[in-house]
Amino acid sequence: MKFVDEAYIDVSAGDGGAGCVSFRHEKYKEFGGPNGGDGGRGGHVFAVADPNLNTLVDFRFSRRHDAKRGEHGMGSDMFGAAGDDITLKMPVGTIISDAETGEVLFELLTPGEVITIAKGGDGGFGNLRFKSAINRAPRQKTPGWPGEKRNLKLELKVLADVGLLGMPNAGKSTLISAISNARPRIADYPFTTLHPNLGVVRVGPEQSFVVADLPGLIEGASEGAGLGHLFLRHLQRTRLLLHVVDMAPFDEGVDTVAQAKAIVNELKKYDPALYNKPRWLVLNKLDMVPLEHREALVKDFVKRFKFKGPVFQISALTREGCESLIKIIYQHVKAQQKAEQTPEAVDQRFAPDTE
């Protein structure tokens, strides 16, 4: 499956209905006066943030989205009915921008959030509106106003607390399936993951965080090599990066330290801010390393890699070390969330007396 994190759509709100020219026709009243109603407004186009979606793939197959126009006004003071609105479901985190100018118009960040992306036109006035002391029998009316039409670009940045990065076949998909509800495709060959996978990790009652598994990076990813560069942008909103390293590669001639350094260099080239994010080292597949050699292997790797941050030894396959890892991650994420919250202003009338 090809992950679509970018899509273009054309939306058209409904035009307003035209006003009506009409006069009352009653027995014994030759000049009954105007009674033409207004036209109905055109339908709006809404976008709603749906937490159950995590791709924009549906919009690749349905580009045009048109709301209904309003009905025309009629005689007997009858106003036209409003056109039916349409609501487009989009993943949480969708950025909506003008496809021609690139200007960001909206951003869906909260589940259930609803925004109006194209407003329907107002209905036209019927001749009832033009009645005055001077003009008792107006024959004026106005057409409905046109609805908004927009060519939009949709872009999705995955909203995850934790991002997994590493070389292809490092065991990232096995890790996310071991600690979360995600069930990505897993196989014993590189580039199994072709699109981002999101998983919710439940640490305890009302304690959880979201983790994103992205396609593996290779050297030259920041210049467009491989698949990973297409999804590096998804890591920009994460609070923590887990650098997963395969400590038991099939090819014994592979230099795991050189591969790990290549990943870090790609981050630095792509975005210095991404490089400076909190990054932890997760040494995976240690179940395949003999116990008597494990400590020396880990110590040698960390020394050659010159890594100063937290280091975790796990086996995603047997889940060894995973439980303690997710608890520490949750504590870090909660601390980050608390630090990001802006303190509420305190009304000085109710502020505690510090004297």
Curated annotation (Swiss-Prot):
Name of this protein: GTPase Obg
Gene this protein is translated from: obg
Enzyme class label: hydrolase
Biological processes annotated in GO: ribosome biogenesis
The keyword Hydrolase is annotated on this UniProt entry: yes
Originating organism: Albidiferax ferrireducens (strain ATCC BAA-621 / DSM 15236 / T118) (Rhodoferax ferrireducens)
Cofactor requirements of the protein: Mg(2+)
Annotated Mg(2+) binding sites: 173, 193
EC number(s) on file: 3.6.5.-
Homology family: Belongs to the TRAFAC class OBG-HflX-like GTPase superfamily. OBG GTPase family.
Domain of life: Bacteria
GO cellular component, as recorded: cytoplasm
PROSITE patterns, per the entry: G_OBG, GTP1_OBG, OBG
Domain Obg: 1-159
Job of this protein: An essential GTPase which binds GTP, GDP and possibly (p)ppGpp with moderate affinity, with high nucleotide exchange rates and a fairly low GTP hydrolysis rate. Plays a role in control of the cell cycle, stress response, ribosome biogenesis and in those bacteria that undergo differentiation, in morphogenesis control.
Family matches, as SUPFAM superfamilies: Obg GTP-binding protein N-terminal domain, P-loop containing nucleoside triphosphate hydrolases
Keywords from the UniProt entry: Cytoplasm, GTP-binding, Hydrolase, Magnesium, Metal-binding, Nucleotide-binding
Domain OBG-type G: 160-334
